[in-house]
Amino acid sequence: MKFFCKLESGSSLPEYATSGASGADVRANINEPIAILPGQRALIPTGISVEIPHGYEIQVRSRSGLASKYGVIVLQSPGTVDADYRGEIRVILANLGEATFIVEPGMRIAQLVVAKVEQVSFVETQEELTATARGTGGFGHTGEC
């Protein structure tokens, strides 16, 4: 399957690092380094716009190396790029680490994962919902954090 991309000057196509990778790396399309202080966030351009076919989305996810080594994650991960969006994909990076993180021009900053999606009809009901073993147990309902 082909997804057509429009590239701004200096940007490059998303790339899969290995033949088995689910996510394609995207790079920072910036001219100068950007410093993200601890506890802060920054919106980083990729220079990529994508024509996503109907029935698909692109999920923007953190790179595990940035998260584990520096505490830098994609905020609102996964971020969703809808099929009808035609603008530049930009990545919100958050620094949860203890040191300032420098985003360098061309640095791999996130991964794009393609996923199938389906729109459904949400229908209000006055009836009880079907019972399950979990029931209404929400966050931490298993007692494990």
UniProtKB/Swiss-Prot annotation:
User: Which keywords has UniProt assigned to this entry?
Assistant: Hydrolase, Magnesium, Metal-binding, Nucleotide metabolism
Question: Which is a Pfam family this sequence falls into?
Answer: dUTPase
Q: Where does substrate bind?
A: 63-65, 76, 80-82
Q: In which pathway does it act?
A: Pyrimidine metabolism; dUMP biosynthesis; dUMP from dCTP (dUTP route): step 2/2
BP term (GO), one: dUMP biosynthetic process
Q: Name one GO molecular function term.
A: magnesium ion binding
Cofactor or coenzyme needed: Mg(2+)
Q: Which reaction does it catalyse?
A: dUTP + H2O = dUMP + diphosphate + H(+)
Q: Which SUPFAM superfamilies match?
A: dUTPase-like (SSF51283)
InterPro entries with a match to the protein in the record: dUTPase, dUTPase-like, dUTPase-like_sf, dUTPase_trimeric
Source superkingdom: Bacteria
| The protein's Enzyme Commission number | 3.6.1.23
Q: What class of enzyme is it?
A: hydrolase
Cited Gene3D superfamilies = 2.70.40.10
Q: Does the keyword Hydrolase apply?
A: yes
- Function per UniProt: This enzyme is involved in nucleotide metabolism: it produces dUMP, the immediate precursor of thymidine nucleotides and it decreases the intracellular concentration of dUTP so that uracil cannot be incorporated into DNA.
**Family per similarity comment:** Belongs to the dUTPase family.
Kindly provide the name given to this protein in its UniProt entry: Deoxyuridine 5'-triphosphate nucleotidohydrolase
Q: Can you name the source organism?
A: Chlamydia trachomatis serovar D (strain ATCC VR-885 / DSM 19411 / UW-3/Cx)
